[in-house]
Amino acid sequence: MQFMGVFFTHSGAIKYHRYLNSLEITNETMPVPRKLSSNCGIGVKFTTDKDINDMITEDIEKMFKIEDNNYMEVYDCN
């Protein structure tokens, strides 16, 4: 499954990128589509079959599952 993490800060996105690298999960930092967030503008896109709930960190504002170029929110910090 493919996901996009949206963050409060650029540093949060970079930390998550490093976190996924430590788990050997291929990921990419990239601009966040405006329809997903107006905060920091940098997100992390990755693919995993692991339980996404175990991969939520305090830096994440929202997490989206990507299917057929559609974004479905699977986590919101609020």
Question: How does the language model describe each region?
Answer:
Residues 4-5:
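A short beta-strand micro-motif
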Residues 23-26, 57-59:
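Short secondary-structure junctions
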